[in-house]
Amino acid sequence: MSVKRLLDCTPSDLAAYSKTDLLAAIAGSEGRVLACETIGLTPPLLVDVTNAEYAASLSTDILLLNMFDVQHPVINALPKVPEEETVREIKRLTGRVVGINLEPCDPQAAKSNDGTLWKMSSGRLATAENASRAADMGVDLIVLTGNPGNGVSNELIVESLKDISAAVGDRVMLAAGKMHASGVAGEGGEQIMTPADAEAFMVAGADI
């Protein structure tokens, strides 16, 4: 099957694409793919329209759902569907590639977020079980990363990548890396990701 650039894909194209096809479509877009992260737990900006749909209307190519619990998914303003259909409903409404974040966090460090928006839940942990459930729900991309204060180290990302790659690496695109230190001393600034970390991520199974 001929693969288009992601920039040229229709929703029906994306629905038919495999993981390999999606990676080729992204690569073919030469760095011009736009991803946007949204949080379904927070109130929608447009009240009765999901933030994912709003982001799609602003030309996002990949929707990344942060704080998405695969065991108890919540997307405010999404029409009522069975929990296992949550991701497929977002894809139906937006026609976009949909990914989620999973976090290989340090349980002790994550306790600092108890009582806050960032409080960890079992359905957000970077485990093979959660990744398999996400794949079954229709997720196209899993990003192994960390929210503020959850104690996600690059070493933990590598270890979870190995397990998740073995479980769903043939079905789902896997990405790895952090935008901030996630509460890990020594992994801020230039140390957020080093060339050695990038190599370790690739060896462990990261596609992106």
Model-found features: residue ranges?
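Structural motif
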Residues: 37-41, 67-68
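Alpha/beta enzyme core
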Residues: 47-71, 76-78, 112-208
